[in-house]
A protein has these predicted regions:
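Short amphipathic alpha-helix that is part of the acyltransferase structural core
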Residues: 1-46, 152-188, 192
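Acyl-donor-binding surface of acyltransferase catalytic domains
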Residues: 1-4, 66-67, 74-158
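Structural signal for short hydrophobic segments within the conserved structured cores
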Residues: 11, 57-59, 161, 207-209
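Helix N-cap/beta->alpha junction signal
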Residues: 14, 119-120, 164, 208
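Short hydrophobic/aromatic beta-strand or adjacent loop that forms the aromatic wall/cage
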Residues: 56, 136-140, 206-208
Length: 213
């Protein structure tokens, strides 16, 4: 692994770094996607997953004491998140992060590693230039301003309600079975799923609904 540029240093992350890491991820997303979707709570809940070891599975790059880049590896080494603040890009920090994350993924026993990047973005080009290839394509759906979704009644015998009690575990099972059909997708533990869905900071009960028959 190449050394970081002069003036930069690497260290482990702690929960107290959440706000700084969010600021880096947000700045990177704005530069790559042109709009901000990530929320502080997204990172908070990811770090709260029982399977995630923040001290071992994540890294920060600092400059003058401030975090300017960060990366983390999760889901048994198969999924990475990483960002370099736009003000510090083009100095080899991204390459250093990629090497660190790849090494950590191998140590977790992963045979592949993936990260989401907007098509045609700087991050997308960086990953391709680093030897990565497109695995899946996903779309962000948007409802145009002023548009309305027409009411569509459920078929007879079905009912919609807010998930409570045993509904939560049943909803987890449905999600795992549905998305488990994706090639290469590993089953997520119930505890990890809860951390990012039901127990995510700010989540309201109405945000998880189920259809019953």
């Amino acid at each position: 692994m190449d050394a970081l540029p002069s003036g930069y240093a690497a260290r482990s992350l702690t929960p107290a770094d959440l706000d700084q890491v969010y600021a880096v991820y947000a700045a990177d997303e704005l530069a790559n996607a042109g709009e901000l979707s990530i929320e502080r709570e997204d990172i908070d809940s990811d770090w709260s997953r029982p399977s995630f070891d923040l001290a071992a599975d994540a890294i920060a790059v600092t400059h003058a004491g401030a975090i300017v880049a960060a990366g983390e590896i999760a889901r048994h080494g198969n999924r990475a998140e990483a960002a370099v603040h736009p003000d510090h890009q083009g100095r080899g920090i991204g390459q250093w992060l990629e090497s660190w994350l790849a090494d950590r993924a191998v140590r977790q026993g992963a045979s592949s590693i993936a990260q989401i990047a907007p098509q045609g973005s700087t991050k997308d080009r960086f990953l391709i230039d680093s030897g990565y290839a497109l695995a899946h394509t996903s779309w962000v759906l948007q409802l145009p301003e002023g548009a309305a979704i027409p009411d569509r009644p459920l078929p007879p015998g079905y009912a919609l309600r807010t998930a409570t009690g045993d509904d939560i575990a049943a909803a987890y099972e449905v999600v795992q079975r549905a998305f488990g059909e994706w090639e290469g997708r590993a089953r997520e533990s119930y505890e990890d799923w809860r951390a990012t869905i039901v127990d995510r900071p700010g989540t309201q009960p109405w945000q998880l609904r189920v259809i019953t028959q």
